Regions:
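Hydrophobic packing and interface segments
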Residues: 1-458, 462
Length: 463
C-alpha cells in the first residue's frame, strides 16, 4: 500500500526504491535468523568443552546477521545512488534515494515492535506456566512454551534488532546525502561536480571503511582457554575495539583524500573530528551500557543483593538503576552532537544554504554506526547463547554444559544492551539531521515552536 501511495503521489521510481529497501531489510533478518537457529545447536555441542570453546561459534553465527545487515544496507544504498543519480540522472533522484530508507523503516517497525511483543509474551508466558504454576525449571521440555520462548529470542533479538539497526544505518547514510542535495538544490547532473561529489560520497566512504574494519576485527574474536567471565567479555569486545581503532585511522585518511588540498587542512580535519566524535560517543555508550548491565560492576551486584529481601526491592532497584543509566547516555549524546557541530563548522561555514555544523552532525551518526557489522554480530551472539542453554536443558545434558551456556548467556544480556544503546543514540542524531533535511526540502525559513501547525508545510513556506 505504501509503495502504491509513493508511486501515485510522489515518484513512481520512488516506489521501486522503497520496495528494494524493504526487501533487503527483510532478507538480512531472514538470513540472520536462519543461521542463528542453526548455530545454537552447534554452540550447545561446543559448550561440552567449556564456554571458551562455544563463544566463537556463537559469535560467528551472530556475524552472519551483523554483516548481512551492514553489507546489504550499504550495498543497497550504493546501488540506488549509482542507478538513479549517476546512471539514469532522473528528476527527483534524491527523493528516490530517500525512499530506500523509508522501505527499511517500514520493515523495522514490524520486525522490532511485532517481534519484541512476541518475544516478551512468549518469555513471560513460559515462565508463568512453568516456574509459577507447574514448578518446573526454565527451558524444561515438559513445558511446550519453551519452544515459543526460544523462537522468540530469535525473532525479537536477532531479526528485530537487526531490522532496527538496518534502518538506523540506512538512515544515517541517507541523512547527509539528502541534506546536501536539498540544501544545495542539486539535480542529478549537478551531483558530479567536484565539491558536491566529495560531500555526497564521504558518508558512503566512511561506511565502507568501517565495514572493512569490522570484518578484520571479527577475525580477532577467539575464545582462548580461559573460562573466566571477564576474559570471555574481553575476547568478545576485542573485535569491536580493534574495528573502531582501524576505522578511526581510515576516517582521517578518507577525509584528507576527499577534502584535502595543499593549502587547506580545516575541511578534512573538521569532518574527521565530527566522524571521530560520533565513533567515540558510540564506544562510550557501549561502555556505559556494559557498566550498568554487566555482573562485573557494582550496579548489577547491588540489584542482586537487593533480591535477598524479595521481588519488590529487586524491581525497584532495577528501575532506579535503569533510570540513572539514561543520564550518562544523554550527556554523551549531547557532547557528541556538540563536537560534531564544532567539527563541521571548522570544515566550512556555509556552502549555499548548507550549514557545516549540521553536516558535521549528520556524518557523526555514521561514525556511531561505522562498525555496525561487528556490533550486531556481538548482539546477535546473545540469543544464540540463550537458545544453546535451552537446548542443553531440553536434551538433559550434564549440568556443566548448562553452566557453560549460562555464562555465555549472561554475557549476551550485556551485549544486547550495548546494541540497544547504539540503535537509540544513532537514531536520535540521525533524526536531527533528517529534520534539517526536511526543512531544506520544503523551504522552511524558520520554525516557530509555539505554533500548533509546526510540521505542516505547503508549496509556499509563507502560506
Amino acid at each position: 500500500v505504501m509503495a502504491i501511495l509513493i508511486a501515485v503521489f510522489i515518484e513512481p521510481l520512488g516506489a521501486v526504491s522503497y520496495v528494494f529497501g524493504a526487501i533487503l531489510s527483510a532478507t538480512a533478518g531472514y538470513a540472520g535468523m536462519s543461521v542463528a537457529t542453526m548455530a545454537n545447536a552447534r554452540t550447545t555441542e561446543a559448550a561440552k568443552d567449556g564456554p571458551a570453546k562455544a563463544l566463537p561459534i556463537a559469535f560467528r553465527g551472530g556475524a552472519v546477521m551483523g554483516f548481512a545487515v551492514a553489507g546489504l544496507a550499504l550495498a543497497g544504498l550504493m546501488i540506488v545512488y549509482i542507478l538513479f543519480v549517476m546512471v539514469l540522472e532522473i528528476d527527483n533522484a534524491f527523493e528516490v534515494v530517500t525512499a530506500y530508507g523509508l522501505g527499511a523503516s517500514s520493515i523495522a517497525l514490524f520486525s522490532r515492535v511485532g517481534g519484541g511483543i512476541y518475544t516478551k509474551a512468549a518469555d513471560v508466558g513460559a515462565d508463568l506456566v512453568g516456574k509459577v504454576e507447574a514448578g518446573i525449571p526454565e527451558d524444561d521440555p515438559r513445558n511446550p512454551a519453551t519452544i515459543a520462548d526460544n523462537v522468540g529470542d530469535n525473532v525479537g533479538d536477532v531479526a528485530g534488532m537487526g531490522a532496527d539497526l538496518f534502518e538506523s544505518y540506512a538512515g544515517s547514510l541517507i541523512a547527509p546525502i539528502s541534506l546536501v542535495a536539498f540544501a544545495l538544490a542539486l539535480s542529478a547532473d549537478e551531483a558530479s561536480d567536484a565539491v558536491n561529489v566529495s560531500l555526497l560520497v564521504f558518508p558512503m566512504a566512511i561506511a565502507f571503511v568501517g565495514m572493512l574494519a569490522s570484518i578484520l576485527g571479527s577475525f580477532l574474536v577467539r575464545g582462548g582457554t580461559s573460562t573466566d567471565s571477564k576474559d570471555l567479555s574481553h575476547a568478545l569486545h576485542l573485535g569491536t575495539n580493534v574495528a573502531m581503532g582501524i576505522t578511526a585511522g581510515a576516517t582521517i585518511a578518507v577525509a584528507f583524500w576527499l577534502f584535502g588540498s595543499e593549502d587547506a587542512f580545516d575541511a578534512p580535519l573538521g569532518l574527521a573530528i565530527a566522524v571521530l566524535g560520533g565513533l567515540v560517543v558510540g564506544w562510550a555508550l557501549g561502555k556505559t551500557a556494559e557498566y550498568y548491565t554487566s555482573d562485573h560492576y557494582p550496579p548489577v551486584k547491588k540489584i542482586a543483593d537487593q533480591s535477598e529481601t524479595g521481588p519488590a526491592t529487586t524491581v525497584l532497584g532495577g528501575i532506579s538503576v535503569g533510570k540513572i543509566s539514561v543520564g550518562a547516555s544523554v550527556v554523551l549524546i549531547i557532547l557528541g552532537v556538540g563536537v560534531a557541530y564544532w567539527g563541521g563548522e571548522l570544515a566550512f561555514d556555509q556552502i549555499g544554504s548548507l550549514d557545516g555544523g549540521i553536516y558535521g552532525i549528520a556524518v557523526a551518526a555514521i561514525g556511531m554506526l561505522a562498525t555496525l557489522g561487528v556490533v550486531v554480530s556481538v548482539d546477535a551472539y546473545g540469543p544464540i547463547a540463550d537458545n544453546a542453554g535451552g537446548i542443553a536443558e531440553m536434551a538433559h545434558l550434564p549440568a556443566e554444559v548448562r553452566e557453560a551456556t549460562d555464562e555465555l548467556d549472561s554475557l549476551g544480556n550485556t551485549t544486547a544492551a550495548v546494541a540497544k544503546g547504539f540503535a537509540i543514540a544513532s537514531a536520535a542524531v540521525t533524526a536531527l539531521a533528517l529534520f534539517f533535511s526536511f526543512k531544506e526540502a520544503v523551504g522552511l525559513e524558520s520554525i516557530d515552536i509555539v505554533k500548533v501547525c509546526l510540521l505542516y508545510t505547503s508549496p509556499s513556506p509563507r502560506d
